[in-house]
Amino acid sequence: MISTVALFWALCVVCIVNMARYFSSLRALLVVLRGCDPLLYQYVDGGGFFTSHGQPNKQMRLVWYIYAQRYRDHHDDEFIRRCERVRGQFILTSALCGLVLISMVALLIWH
């Protein structure tokens, strides 16, 4: 029989791997954004996005831009495709993080 603790740690590893994929896709999206729409790149603080002095309110602009699917009217097909990929990975990663939290609470109650 599979240990519930081992199953929990496997779920944590899957969540961390998906977070890494999400951040990698977000970084690739910013590279495409710099080339196709410099004004939007500057609006979301693309140059300082992954730095310690990045501006969270500008980072949230990009998150809400993607979450609300406002990219669908953009002129660049590559940018649209990357945004759809990032949006899907964000939803998957959010669901996995929620599942990790729920399973952690269940594991604490159960053991």
From Swiss-Prot:
Keyword Transmembrane helix part of the UniProt annotation: yes
InterPro entries attached to this UniProt entry: Universal_stress_protein_B
Extent of the signal sequence: none
Keywords, sorted A to Z: Cell inner membrane, Cell membrane, Membrane, Transmembrane, Transmembrane helix
Membrane topology: Multi-pass membrane protein
Record GO cellular component, one term: plasma membrane
Subcellular location: Cell inner membrane
Pfam family, one: UspB
Keyword Amino-acid biosynthesis found: no
Chain segments annotated as transmembrane: 1-21, 90-110
Main location per the UniProt record: membrane
Family according to the record: Belongs to the universal stress protein B family.
Protein name: Universal stress protein B
Species annotation: Citrobacter koseri (strain ATCC BAA-895 / CDC 4225-83 / SGSC4696)
Gene that this sequence comes from: uspB
